Amino acid sequence: MLPIGIWSLFAVTFTAIAVHGKLSDGRAHLNVPPRWSLPLPPGLPPTGPVTHVNGTVLADISTPHYFNIPIDHNNTSLGTFWTRYWVNYQYYEPGGPVIFMNTGEVNAENYTHFITNSTINGLIAQQESGLLIVMEHRDSLKYLSIEQAIQDNVYFAQNAKLLVPGNTSPDATPWILIGASYSGALTAFQKVAEPDVFYIHYGSSAVIEAQVDFHEYFTPIRQNMPANCSADVQAVIAHVDEVFMGTNTTAQTEIRNIFGRNASVSNDAIAGLLRNNIWSWQTLQPFTASAGGKLEFYEFCDALEVNGRTVSGPKGWGLEHALRAWGAYFSRTTVAKLCTDIDLAECINGTPASSQDDHPVNDADRSWSWQTCTQFGWGRTGAPKGTPTIVSRLRTVQTDVIDFCAYYFPKTFPAYGLPRANETNARYGGWSMHGERMIFVNGNYDTWREASMSAQQTNITVSTASQPIFLVNGFHSSDLLALSAIEPTVAQTQNQILNIVSGWLKDWESYKERRRRRGV
């Protein structure tokens, strides 16, 4: 373990640094899933001073503040590390709530949007005269866990000294905890583990059900992508699986040349490459096109389905055309853009596991991989036989969980075994969890829908007045962004959330009295 003084230098930030073998998009290789987290509005993070509602000019909201948090909440003798947080007081009036977000598995300096009214956080603050905070998540591996992150939030809320008059502790002021994706799950887990610290909890696309085999990640894509594209993708995947699971080496070499230029990697590694074009679905938002964003997923489908000036029918063009078109698109986009200045086999499958032993600790991809390998799972695999699939069935728990974790952490895996997903669900409830004043919002088109409270694969989640569950026609955490109101169901849900929060805040004083009587 690093000495305490050095540890704090590493633990302050999630900023990834360049290391041998990384792709131009920061991933270790093409069979590592992109790390998606909180979505952002278009444009650079906001900077500069802001003006309070009373006309006072306040400090630059992009300036980070620093706060000491115990490295291990179970053994505080280990010392502390510095974490960064950002704050915006422009809407705050005495008595208003504190709207707090732990940004999860990211470098939080890019997430100051979440202390402005370009997000639901800021809209709540504007309506309720609240104070806005985003805090960076801890990053180092030995003490990187759900349980430690929950206590980080508690420790900050109970000990941070905010530059406003009055008592802003959670005993005297209502704190609203907001999170998305993993940090949305953390928000829900917080309600289960520490129900009386934060008054309101709001999880957007909260991935509350840990699953080792998460082939359902691709289900919302298959259900909602253009029918012709879906048909051709499924045809290509079925062909790739049939060939690679067979004995015709000539046919295998043909596929390897089409997608992997016959690089010296396994067939399952070649089959896994095709997910790269499918993964681009999660970059979509309701406003992507209108805001001039890149529609990479639809560019991929156009490459398959537009032949000259002719668009295929709903059943697609069929295997022969789709296979060649996909291979050509993959070569000129994914390989050409991501495998620059790197050996192709290394680009596809990474460097040997032993080279990962001394990897820098302040790497967000690796930090998040530690959490998935130890507590969540979520291997992005092919669907089982009998279920339609747009991903190769050669991608399994073996390739995408066991081998993946051993690649990143060879000193720990595979000896550790599978991720402790069942323990996580048992501890925090998964789909069965319930908490007072807990809001869930999920997207029907979100790749993470099947790990959320709106999963189609379960019927045990129930929306109630105290724990409302909304399903919008949006993507990953669309409800957090003000621009997403271009989609009517998102706009309606955002308005409902503002009304719900307002109603719950009106009950704050009576809640405090009830809590006092309980001796909490």
Predicted regions and their residues:
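C-terminal subdomain of alpha/beta-hydrolase-fold enzymes, centered on the catalytic histidine
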Residues: 276-519
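Short glycine-enriched nucleophile-adjacent loop
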Residues: 182-195, 201, 208
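A catalytic-pocket lid/entrance helix-loop region that shapes and gates access to the active site
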Residues: 197-311, 319-322
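Loop/turn elements at helix/coil->beta-strand transitions in domains of secreted/extracellular proteins
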Residues: 95-99, 128-132, 172-174, 196-199, ...
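Catalytic-loop region of hydrolases
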Residues: 10, 14-134, 499, 503-520
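Alpha/beta-hydrolase fold nucleophile elbow
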Residues: 166-181
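Classical eukaryotic N-terminal signal peptides for Sec-dependent ER targeting/secretion
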Residues: 1-12
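Active-site machinery of serine-nucleophile hydrolases
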Residues: 90, 97-98, 102-154, 369, ...
